[in-house]
Amino acid sequence: MVLAFVLVNCEMRVEKAVIDELKTFDAVKEAIGTFGVYDILVKLEADSDHKLRDVITQKIRKMDKVRTTTTLMIIQEWE
């Protein structure tokens, strides 16, 4: 499994609607509102980095109310 966190900035006062839509995507395991620089923290999990990339670029970044995203890919193992 490939894991990533996406930090989302969205338009003002639409955070709940964006979170609700994010939760409809299969790869999204959690979507929560935050205070600070970013509005939403999204935890994603997929079978491959290609599938994860597709969700981020073709779904999340193309949402009408999403302004910007920052993606953090997780290192699976340290040896």
Annotate each PLM feature.
Residues M1-E79:
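A compositional/biophysical signature of low hydrophobicity enriched in polar/charged and small residues
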